[in-house]
Structure formats: structure tokens, C-alpha cells
UniProtKB/Swiss-Prot annotation:
<comment type="similarity">
    <text>Belongs to the universal ribosomal protein uS14 family.</text>
</comment>
<keyword id="KW-0689">Ribosomal protein</keyword>
<dbReference type="GO" id="GO:0003735">
    <property type="term" value="F:structural constituent of ribosome"/>
</dbReference>
<dbReference type="GO" id="GO:0019843">
    <property type="term" value="F:rRNA binding"/>
</dbReference>
<dbReference type="InterPro" id="IPR018271">
    <property type="entry name" value="Ribosomal_uS14_CS"/>
</dbReference>
<dbReference type="Pfam" id="PF00253">
    <property type="entry name" value="Ribosomal_S14"/>
</dbReference>
<dbReference type="GO" id="GO:0005737">
    <property type="term" value="C:cytoplasm"/>
</dbReference>
<keyword id="KW-0699">rRNA-binding</keyword>
<dbReference type="GO" id="GO:0006412">
    <property type="term" value="P:translation"/>
</dbReference>
<keyword id="KW-0694">RNA-binding</keyword>
<comment type="function">
    <text>Binds 16S rRNA, required for the assembly of 30S particles and may also be responsible for determining the conformation of the 16S rRNA at the A site.</text>
</comment>
<protein>
    <recommendedName>
        <fullName>Small ribosomal subunit protein uS14</fullName>
    </recommendedName>
</protein>
<keyword id="KW-0687">Ribonucleoprotein</keyword>
<comment type="subunit">
    <text>Part of the 30S ribosomal subunit. Contacts proteins S3 and S10.</text>
</comment>
<dbReference type="InterPro" id="IPR001209">
    <property type="entry name" value="Ribosomal_uS14"/>
</dbReference>
<dbReference type="GO" id="GO:0015935">
    <property type="term" value="C:small ribosomal subunit"/>
</dbReference>
<dbReference type="InterPro" id="IPR023036">
    <property type="entry name" value="Ribosomal_uS14_bac/plastid"/>
</dbReference>
């Protein structure tokens, strides 16, 4: 299991990304707009650089909600493959059953 601090850090990053999402999108739109002057584009780039590092969505890592495991996490369930299998075998996940063909 991941340490509690790592899981808390990831939650903090999610909140930071959500907080700055609109501001980042607006600045990126200014930077990508070809009709904007070079000075305005430069100012937008500087403002974007001054935002917190954790405001970038690429800093997020999908983690298992139960264990905090960073690898093999299914987005739909937010569980790792191991915990998803355990939950499915217990019948905790509606509509999910073991494959048979």
C-alpha cells in the first residue's frame, strides 16, 4: 500500500488542478491564438509559468482508491486490477462477472 502522505499529496494535486483549470485554459488559449500580439503572448506565457507546478494535469497520477497503488488502475472503477478482482469475486461491483467462453 502507498503511504498515507502520498495519497494525500495526490488529493491535494487534484484540488489544485481543479482550482486553476479555467485560468490555465484561458492562458493557453491566448498563447495558441495566432491573432494575439507577441507581447500579449509573452505575458500569457510568463503568467502560465508562475502558476503552481501541481496545477498541471500531467502531474496527476491515477491511484487505487483502496490501496493507493499507482499501476494497473482502471479509470472506470478507480481501483487497481487486484482490488477490482477481489471486489468482483465478492459481488460488490454490479454487472461485473468473471469472463467465461
Amino acid at each position: 500500500m502507498a503511504k498515507v502522505g502520498m495519497r494525500e499529496r495526490e488529493l491535494k494535486r487534484e484540488k489544485t488542478v481543479a482550482k486553476y483549470a479555467e485560468k490555465r485554459a484561458a492562458l493557453k488559449a491566448i498563447i495558441a491564438n495566432p491573432n494575439v500580439s507577441d507581447e500579449e503572448r509573452w505575458e500569457a506565457q510568463m503568467k502560465l509559468q508562475k502558476l503552481p507546478r501541481d496545477a498541471s494535469p500531467s502531474r496527476l497520477r491515477n491511484r487505487c482508491q483502496v490501496t493507493g497503488r499507482p499501476h494497473a488502475v482502471l479509470r472506470k472503477f478507480r481501483l487497481s486490477r487486484i482490488k477490482l478482482r477481489e471486489a468482483a469475486m465478492r459481488g460488490d461491483v454490479p454487472g461485473l462477472k468473471k469472463a467465461s467462453w
